[in-house]
Amino acid sequence: MITYETRVKIDELREKYLNFVKLIDPDKLNMELKKMESEMSDPEIWKDQRKAGEISKKVRRIKELLSDISEIERNFEDIDVGIELSEEDPGIAQDIEKIVQEVEKNIRRFQLELILNDPLDQNNAYLSIHPGAGGTESHDWAQMLLRMYMRWAERKGFIVELLDFQPGEEAGLKSATILVKGEYAYGYLKHERGVHRLVRISPFDAAKRRHTSFASVNVVPEISDDIDVEIKPEDIRIDTFRASGHGGQYVNRTDSAVRITHLPTGIVVSCQSERSQHQNKALAMKVLKAKLYQLELAKRREQLDEIQGELKEISWGNQIRSYILQPYTLVKDHRTDIETGNFDAVLDGELDQFIEAELLYFADYKI
């Protein structure tokens, strides 16, 4: 027999789903899809690769949304049929419970796809980490964060490239940059930008005192080569240095690593992942271009502080999330109030509950 609680949940899910459908109007989406597919069948459109790429992305997004709608509609049809049959066969109630769980998962995915609507959300993401004041303890915390994000990306099926790693004197890192490659990598990671705080008994303190450490995370989207960002030669300073090792990896014997400073903004990027100085310079310029592009967008939106997360003070009061090991274990996001006591799981990359809550918190539903 279907329980009262299950019936209430079904009604709530149906109402939630219908509210989302009203936002996008599937009939209008189908008409828009046919129009764009007609445009793409014209050979002339492919002469402008940038425009063709934008249309292709839009087509893929609409198809994903319509596919989700069809799947959720089938879920509700199965539930309705199951409810009728359960009056004669009480055993069907268990099957309905499973379908309800499935439709709940599908609606959540549908909701996230509606939220990830910025044109840049689909892009790869550059993620940089910088420790705050505190020496070895904060350097170690920064490396813990680097591992956390790399593990999260691996769990999501993304590809991770370590572009730059500057080790700390005793442990951890002074700075690091990774490229997370995969669909919607930037969309998922963009709200991770900010200051992250750790409270623990420091393994580097002989007196075993409790320490508070900070590290900042900055995230910018990788941008297409055909997007024009002017970088004047006189506005940059290029330095070369010997690549630093990370666990015995990524070490070159020559001064192949490159650091580029953009003088007007103070933005500094470096790259040492490639074998040649020329390759590292090209990649560093690409990262700089992405940061300057995002900076320009931020100025237009009057949100410079939000985009330039790494330039904010890395200290108390600016943190977006706290990771506490002493006197209790807790990871808490200060924007969404999402929290968990499973510190080890979070540091091993289980970030989805935080990232999904962020997306809902900052949601701007549009197509």
From Swiss-Prot:
Modification after translation is described as: Methylated by PrmC. Methylation increases the termination efficiency of RF2.
Q: Which residues carry this modification: N5-methylglutamine?
A: 249
Superkingdom field:
Bacteria
Does the keyword field hold Thylakoid?
no
Q: Which UniProt keywords apply?
A: Cytoplasm, Methylation, Protein biosynthesis
Query: Which GO molecular function annotation, any one, does this entry have?
Result: translation release factor activity, codon specific
Grouped into one coarse class, the protein's main location is cytoplasm
Is Membrane found in the keyword set? no
Q: What is this protein called?
A: Peptide chain release factor 2
Q: From what organism does this protein derive?
A: Pseudothermotoga lettingae (strain ATCC BAA-301 / DSM 14385 / NBRC 107922 / TMO)
The organism that produces this protein has a lineage beginning with:
Bacteria, Thermotogati, Thermotogota, Thermotogae, Thermotogales
Supply the gene name: prfB
